[in-house]
C-alpha cells in the first residue's frame, strides 16, 4: 500500500518539475488517498492483533 503511495508521489514530483500541473495534482491526490488508507489499515491491524492475544 505504501509502495503505491510512494509511486504516486514520485510521479507527482516528476510531473511538477516538468510543468504538468494537472497531472501533478492528480498524482498527489492519489498518493494522499493511498497513504490515508494505508494508515487506517495499519491501525486496524495493530488493534485487532493485540486483542487476539
Swiss-Prot record:
UniProt record similarity statement: Belongs to the UPF0391 family.
Membrane-protein topology: Multi-pass membrane protein
Subcellular location(s) of the protein: Cell membrane
Chief location category: membrane
Signal peptide: none
Keyword annotations from UniProtKB, A to Z: Cell membrane, Membrane, Transmembrane, Transmembrane helix
Domain of life: Bacteria
Pfam families registered for this protein in UniProt: DUF1328
Listed transmembrane segments: 4-24, 27-47
NCBIfam families per the UniProt record, alphabetical: PRK13682.1-4, PRK13682.1-5
Protein name per Swiss-Prot or TrEMBL: UPF0391 membrane protein SG0393
HAMAP family per the UniProt record, alphabetical: UPF0391
InterPro entries cross-referenced by the UniProt entry: DUF1328
Any one GO cellular component localisation term in the record: plasma membrane
